[in-house]
Structures are given as C-alpha cells and as structure tokens.
Design a protein with these regions (language model features):
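Extracytoplasmic "Venus flytrap"/periplasmic binding protein-like
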Residues: 62-132, 167-169, 173-176, 274, ...
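Glycine-centered hinge/linker elements that transmit conformational signals in sensory
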Residues: 185, 226-255
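Extracytoplasmic/periplasmic substrate-recognition and gating elements
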Residues: 243, 247-248, 288-357
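Conserved N-terminal structural module of periplasmic/extracytoplasmic solute-binding proteins
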Residues: 2-107, 307, 434-443
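Hinge/lid segment of periplasmic solute-binding proteins
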Residues: 103-156, 208-209, 214-216, 296, ...
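Long, aromatic- and glycine/proline-rich binding clefts that accommodate carbohydrate-like moieties
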Residues: 302, 310-311, 355-402
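Extracytoplasmic/periplasmic solute-binding protein
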Residues: 144-152, 157, 179-230, 239, ...
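Conserved C-terminal helix/tail region of periplasmic/extracytoplasmic solute-binding proteins
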Residues: 167, 383-443
Length: 443
C-alpha cells in the first residue's frame, strides 16, 4: 500500500476523508542547517500555564544558542484538538515539525504513516534507546522494530489522600479495590467534607477511570479488531463512576463541572479524603496548600468494581502507560533540526529541569536514577511498573473519545442527580458503534 493510500485509509479511520500528501518513512533527513524556524506542537498545561510559557521561552533561547535556529510553540487544549491537528497536518502535508503527543495518541499517529519511523541512525542521533527508561518505550510503536514515539516525560497515575482525614475516620490504609474505596469514601463524607474529588468534565480523566476498571475486569476495550465498549464490565465501570455522585453522595455535586485542576484545588482545601488519577506533579500545588505535610500518594485500586479479587484475564493495571512522546513529521523539511531539538529536551539536565518545574517524571534513565531519594517517587515508580499500555490501534483515539463522550452526554443527568439505565445503555451502544467503525477503518 502506498503512503498516500495508507494516509487516506488511516484518516478515514479517524473520521476524516481527504487526499493526503506525505513522503516515505525513515531516519532523519531534509534540511536542518542553522537558521530558520522549527515548529513544535505541545499540549497546553492548564495547571501551570505561566510556567509552560516561561519554559517555551527559555527552551527556545537555549535552542537558538545551540543551533542558530528559532523554535515556535503552539498548543492544543483537548484530545479532540490533538486528533484534529494530526488529521489536518497529515492531509495538507504541512504543520508542526515536532509533535508532543499523549502516549495514547501515538497509535493514531503511527497509523497515518506520516511520522518518521525510527531506525538505528535516528535513535543514535538522539543518544540511543539506552538513554531512556526501558518501560517508557512501551508505546513507541507496535513492536521494537516499528517505532515513531520518542519518550519525553512519564506520568504514571496514582491517587493522593489526606492522612489526617483517613485517620480520623478510622481508616488505617488506603483502599486497594474500588468497592473498598467506595466504603471508605462513605465514612469520609460528612457535612461539607467529601470522600472523593474527581473531575467529571475533564477532557482526559473520565475515560482513564473507565479503562482502568474494565482492564482490571479483563476487558481491554479493543481485542484484536473487536471493540468491547458495550460490555457488562464497561457498564459496571460507568455505574460505579457515576454512582459516587448520584447514589453514594461521596463527591461534591460541583464536580460535574470540574476539570482535573479544579478537583485538585478542592482536595488542596483539606476537606476531601481522596483525589483520584493524579500524579506526583500535584505536589507542586499541594505543598503550598492547607494540606501541605498532611497528604500521601498511593496506587489506584486494582481490583474491579463488584469483586474482591481480579477475575481470570484481569490485569493488575494501576495506571495507563502515561506520559508524552515526541514524534517527527515525515513531511518536515527540517528533520535534522527536529532531532537536534528532541535530543536537547531529552538530555539529563533538561529532563531534571522539566521535573523541577512541572513534576513530570524524567524518561532519561540517568535523570530518573538521580531522583531515587524523593519519597514520592517510590509510589510513582511502583505505578509505572504496574502501568499497562492502551491498545496499539489506529482506532484508539476515537475509542478514547467515544468513552469520553458517554460522560459528556451524561453531564446533564449527573447534574440533576441520576443517569438512567436506558440512557447509559444507549450511549454505550453509540460508543460501541463509533469505536468499532474507527477500528474497522484503521490500518
């Protein structure tokens, strides 16, 4: 199949039919001497927007000093924006030279055939695969010989809890199952104090919770070429997630409108037992809040709702294999310059500086090993060890969005206090149809 045909097919799988122009894959090629401007796309950091802009500025200055070339950054705000940018760029054959993509979107990028496949020469240009923490390479491509994603940062997810509130409620250790978490949250909820802080309106958090519960129950959501959204394990996951608000009343009703940043801010006030699906970067906020010195991290529950142990086929998934990968556009005429940029921001000192500012764990092996004295990293490292990659399918981006859309469509019902079985069933059926269609078309 030609690159042009592969692109059209892949983009159809992502929901966009159009003619596409792109070159062939391989190692670094194309212009890349001094001068000119490199274009880089990153996710907008809603939690630390000012710090991100300052990082853009200092990184650009460093790159200018090293190469004589400028860097311009643009950002995307949502998963849908991320997908749209990939689509429009590969169709037109122009756009960013370097993309910073969430790990779960790497399969979608790979399926287009529009990003440089990393041969030995390409890896050597940036310091070799041995430069990176081995587990961070787990979603760089479908296999070790077909990779496009260069690890940038790792973000294994954990939960954070208020030590004082748990002790006061007679809870001696954090929950390890979702049912136990529900029981503890009920004990923690009293007056204006709530058991759980979560973000129903966040663009990323909801689907991760659903994926985690389903994966622990033995449903990977994509099994080969079969999507399994309209499934009892997935339905149970949504019922549990929605039930914290509608049935158990352990979540602040305002959470229907919260982003992850707002949920973190609520936990930081000191009136919530648990904050779910965060990372150690939360410490930057928490250490300046009323809960400073009163919180600790723990693994997310790994036993699915309604169970006391994982069933056959269930995975010990404490987190998605989460973080950001860097990919270089095949259409870029500045690939040599792009790989110089990638090398610069994945070197040890740059990685440690990024960790200091944002709290994201380094994927540079030398940088990561230098942080072992940080007590927060013990839990994060365990979460990384128990991280499971989302399915490497070109249709995953749409499956992820379909899972999110079930929550988006349920927000009005959540705000009113209930989501009916009929409404949930209909939304799961629609999500199943959309996801299966995307996977069927993906290459």
């Amino acid at each position: 199949m030609s690159t042009r045909t592969r692109l059209v097919a892949a983009l159809a799988g992502a929901g966009l039919m159009a003619s596409a122009l792109a070159g062939c894959g391989g190692g670094p090629s194309g212009g890349g001497g001094e001068g000119g401007t490199l274009n880089v796309l990153f996710a907008a950091n809603a939690q630390f927007p000012t710090e991100q802009q300052e990082w853009f500025k200092t990184t650009s200055a460093t790159f200018k000093a090293q190469t004589g070339s400028d860097v311009t950054f643009e950002t995307f705000a949502t998963a849908n924006d991320e997908l749209t940018k990939i689509q429009t760029s590969v169709v037109s054959g122009q756009g960013p030279d370097v993309y910073g993509l969430g790990t779960t979107f790497t399969p979608t990028a790979y399926s287009t055939g529009a990003f440089v496949k990393l041969d030995d020469a390409a890896w050597s240009t940036i310091g070799g695969k041995e430069k990176f923490v081995p587990s961070s390479l787990g979603i760089s491509g479908p296999d070790a010989g077909n990779q496009i994603g260069i690890p940038f940062v790792s973000r294994p997810f954990v939960m954070v809890y208020n030590k004082d509130l748990l002790k006061k409620a007679g809870i001696d250790k954090p929950a390890t199952s979702w049912d136990e978490l529900e029981d503890q949250a009920k004990k923690l909820t009293t007056g204006d104090q709530h058991g759980i802080a979560t973000a129903y309106k966040d663009n990323f958090d909801p689907w991760k919770l659903i994926w985690g519960m389903a994966t622990q129950a033995g449903n990977p959501l994509i099994d080969g070429k079969t999507v399994k959204i309209d499934d009892p394990a997935v339905k149970k996951a949504y019922e549990t997630y929605f039930g914290w608000l509608t049935k158990d009343k352990v979540v602040d009703p305002a959470a229907v409108g919260w982003s992850n940043t707002q949920a973190l801010a609520s936990f930081a006030e000191g009136k919530t037992g648990y904050f779910l699906f965060t990372s150690t970067l939360a410490s930057i906020t928490l250490d300046k809040s009323p809960v400073a010195g009163r919180y600790a991290y723990a693994l997310m529950p790994t036993i699915p709702p309604g169970a006391t142990s994982r069933p056959a086929g269930g995975l010990d998934a404490a987190s998605i294999l989460s973080g950001d990968n860097l990919v270089v556009a095949d259409y870029s005429k500045k690939q040599d310059l792009a790989f110089q940029f990638v090398k610069m921001i994945t070197d040890k000192d740059a990685q440690l500086e990024y960790y200091k500012i944002f709290g994201n764990l380094p994927v540079n092996a030398e940088a990561a090993s230098s942080l072992t004295s940080d007590p927060n990293l013990k839990v994060a490292a365990e979460a990384l060890d128990k991280s499971v990659a989302t399915p490497f399918s070109g249709g995953w981006g749409d499956v992820q969005l379909a899972l999110t859309n079930v929550v988006v469509q349920s927000i009005p019902g959540l705000a009113q206090g209930s989501v009916s079985d009929a409404d949930l069933a209909a939304r799961l059926a629609d999500a199943q149809k959309a996801g299966q269609s995307a996977v069927d078309r993906a290459k």
